[in-house]
């Protein structure tokens, strides 16, 4: 309860500051604290969109970040192609993390148009500060999750072959006692395994599946059986256990990929697996 109280106090300080800052026109809370999926806990972050007249100016100076509490560290992520606005990921004393997005008025103006809410806001949002009456124009959140699409056959086959390409190297590295290199390859294999688990969940369910990024909530959306098998795919930093984990990883991937191919009516590259496994 102490962590939740500290988080609430920090949120209140951010809100008070936003009210008194002329540059800030709106403050929007997103994330688990704005959704209705019951996933809020003591470790939940604060996700705040600061809608400002001059977000670029705010991004150039961190002084405002220090107004809300004792700052431990700040991760600066500037706007790039896949990210329209700069973000500042801040950890405050007490272990409270706040993800600030510094956006211009266009962020809300676009969603107030026929384009509608983006997937983040569609899951749930709360207007904590609204100086320009955006609430009148923004659609209400539906609290629905975005629907993930299956890849096409070409991409599926390419990714399966990429997995077996990576798998080809691991036994060789282990034979050379290059454990770190083996683990690095295994890391790429795990990324491809997660992708296949996602595709498997989509393929076997007729209804949309709420798949989160980076495997969050995987035990829920992938199922207990896959969760149990997945645990065996992680090994210790020794050759013997790494080999065991490698066998578990390749076995799980092969099974899931074959099931996806069968459900979708796609071919499976058996010859590639036989040659590289």
Predicted segments with their positions:
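Metal-dependent nucleotidyltransferase catalytic core
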Residues: 1-22, 30-42, 49-111
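Conserved NTP/Mg2+-binding pocket subregion across the NTase superfamily
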Residues: 3, 67-176, 181
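Conserved nucleotidyltransferase catalytic core and NTase-mimicking acidic/glycine-rich helix/loop elements
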Residues: 146-277
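Flexible, active-site-adjacent loop/turn segments at secondary-structure boundaries
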Residues: 41, 125-127, 216
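Short amphipathic alpha-helical segments, especially helix-boundary/capping motifs
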Residues: 10-13, 63, 141-147, 230-231
């Amino acid at each position: 309860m102490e962590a939740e109280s500290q988080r609430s106090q920090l949120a209140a300080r951010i809100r008070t500051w936003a009210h008194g800052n002329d540059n800030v026109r709106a403050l929007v809370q997103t994330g688990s604290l704005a959704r209705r999926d019951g996933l809020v806990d003591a470790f939940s972050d604060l996700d705040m969109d600061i809608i400002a007249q001059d977000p670029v100016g705010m991004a150039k100076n961190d002084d405002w970040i220090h107004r809300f509490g004792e700052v431990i560290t700040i991760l600066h992520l500037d706007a790039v192609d896949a990210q329209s606005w700069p973000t500042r990921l801040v950890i405050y004393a007490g272990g409270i993390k706040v993800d600030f997005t510094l956006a211009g008025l266009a962020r809300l103006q676009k969603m107030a148009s026929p384009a509608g809410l983006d997937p983040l806001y569609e899951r749930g949002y709360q207007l904590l500060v609204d100086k320009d009456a955006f609430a009148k124009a923004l659609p209400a959140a539906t609290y629905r999750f975005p629907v993930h699409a299956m890849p096409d056959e070409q991409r599926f086959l390419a990714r399966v072959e990429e997995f077996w390409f990576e798998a080809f190297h691991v036994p060789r590295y282990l034979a050379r006692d290059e454990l770190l290199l083996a683990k690095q390859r295994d890391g790429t294999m795990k990324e491809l395994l997660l992708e296949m688990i996602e595709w498997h969940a989509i393929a076997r369910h007729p209804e949309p599946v709420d798949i989160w990024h980076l495997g969050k909530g995987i035990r829920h959306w992938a199922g207990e059986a896959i969760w149990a098998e997945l645990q065996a795919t992680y090994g210790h930093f020794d050759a013997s256990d790494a080999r065991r984990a490698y066998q578990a990883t390749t076995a799980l991937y092969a099974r899931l990929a074959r099931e996806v191919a069968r459900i979708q009516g796609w071919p499976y590259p058996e010859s590639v697996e036989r040659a590289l496994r």
